[in-house]
Amino acid sequence: ALPQDNTAVARIDTLVREGLLTRDLATILHGLRKVRNKAVHENYSSVTDSKNFLLMAYGMCEWFMQTYGDWSYTHKDFVMPEENVMIVSVDKEAEEKKEAELAKQAEENAANAPKVARDERKKQANKVANQRPKTEAETRFLIDEQLRMVGWEADTENIRYSKDVRPTKGRKLAIAEYPTNSTVGNRGYADYALFIGEKLVGIIEAKAIHKDIPSVIDYQGKDYPRCIREEDEKYVIGKWGEFKVPFTFATNGRPYLEQYRTKSGIWFLDLRKPDNSPMALHGWMSPDGMEELLAA
């Protein structure tokens, strides 16, 4: 049943509450909703956002097809439309008529489709959501949202080193593409460096969904904290053997799932003790939580 408050927010939240929509997919729908509102009410436009959200919308459509349509459908790579500078005359009346015909046909197909038990549908929805491929842009979008929810300022497109964002007193920043002297991975750029004020407290490495995340911790996750540049030494709050950052994280943006143990969740390693092992977290540490751990 539709919620009493029949807004987009309420509908999305109802689907999550009833187990028909994962948190990640809900985050994407909320992102689409917000950027749409921004475009309509603030005249906002961004080619980068448009391309990223178009890819995510395509991924949502594939999930919908595999959940409510053809369960045998297999993923097909999205092809970005070429830029078209031609002005095309559109017959609006014909377009609306065609849309109405397609909607009617879809309703008839739905009415004649085999009935699927609710629990079976939920199982399929979650299975498809957890197995679907994610683009790097989607992974970054999800991580940004997750970090913001626990109190970090995160925005991969705007809060990044190349846009002159630097550690600042009074701010809790997740600065994207932060340079180090490392020679491994992304040319020495950490996906995010976490700063509480002017204190460098963590490094985050974001990876593709098929990667084994604990191995990322042992590779880039350890190398970046070793290779902090001389000009960034002023942000270092201590040294633990060869490490100049206390905490390191790796993730692919996927929520922790026991059946995909090493390929899901947020993996964390406290570098302050050499015998510590990587462990899976169910959510990001907040700045306050990190400060409490540092003080322990």
Where do the PLM segments sit?
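Alpha-helical structural motif
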Residues: 8-11, 32, 53, 139, ...
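Charge-enriched, short contiguous segments at helix-coil
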Residues: 23-76
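ATP-dependent helicase/translocase motor core
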Residues: 69-296
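Short alpha-helix boundary/capping elements
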Residues: 1-4, 20, 61, 65, ...
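Alpha-helix N-cap/helix-initiation sites
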Residues: 5, 47-50, 136
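Short coil/turn segments at secondary-structure boundaries
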Residues: 20-24, 41-44, 48, 180, ...
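Short, charged amphipathic alpha-helical segments flanked by flexible coils
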Residues: 2-35
